[in-house]
A protein has these predicted regions:
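Hydrophobic alpha-helical transmembrane segments of membrane proteins
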Residues: 1-201
Length: 201
């Protein structure tokens, strides 16, 4: 398939994502507390990726009518592009934290599933909720709730827990990875089966 051009509405979010990832990495490397240093960049990364993915989904919904195959390809490609932008920072962080390569690859798989899943959420919200103010609240409010509430209770269903656990090779990370791979796969299949409702604005 043809490589999609980045929509103008996503140029600034992608630039901001790369800059903030670099800033988060620098802050993590310079942080004096070693316990915070081990997870700070991963927390920053997974949070920024979720926000960017929601913006990807919303922008894609407003791109115009496209065949579902092309639409799915664009969502997958932009999710991969976001991961590719983060990859150099992740490689530096792996060297600094001495994470194993299996843990590193599992973390990449999780980040892709996490990003694609939230891109589908952003797309669906943009297709269903037409009022911009309500959509903004649902999009970012829902993301904050889904990210922070499980963190308070220690549930391995938020990227803020899953990604550090995968990075360190702990069991809850594998559970979260399986959950996000399943949810993103089921979400993609469900979205594929609803062409009229989710055909774009």
């Amino acid at each position: 398939m043809k490589i999609p051009a980045l929509p103008s509405s996503l140029v600034t979010p992608f630039h901001g994502f790369a800059i903030l990832c670099g800033t988060g990495l620098l802050a993590a490397l310079l942080w004096p507390d070693p316990l915070v240093r081990r997870v700070l960049f991963l927390h920053v990364l997974v949070f920024l990726q979720g926000i960017l993915s929601l913006q990807i989904g919303e922008a894609e919904c407003g791109y115009g009518p496209l065949p579902l195959g092309a639409r799915l390809w664009r969502l997958l490609f932009f999710s991969f592009l976001a991961l590719a932008l983060a990859l150099p920072f992740l490689l530096v962080y792996r060297a600094e934290t001495a994470a194993s390569w299996p843990s590193f690859l599992a973390s990449l798989a999780f980040l892709f599933a996490h990003g694609f899943g939230w891109a589908l959420v952003g797309y669906a919200l943009a297709a269903v909720i037409r009022w911009e103010g309500l959509r903004f609240l649902a999009k970012y409010g829902g993301f904050l709730v889904a990210s922070l509430v499980p963190l308070v209770f220690g549930w391995p269903i938020t990227g803020l827990i899953v990604l550090p656990a995968l990075w360190e090779g702990r069991g809850p990370g594998l559970l979260g990875l399986a959950l996000y791979l399943s949810l993103s796969g089921v979400g993609g299949i469900w979205w594929w089966k609803k062409p009229r409702r989710f055909s774009g604005k």
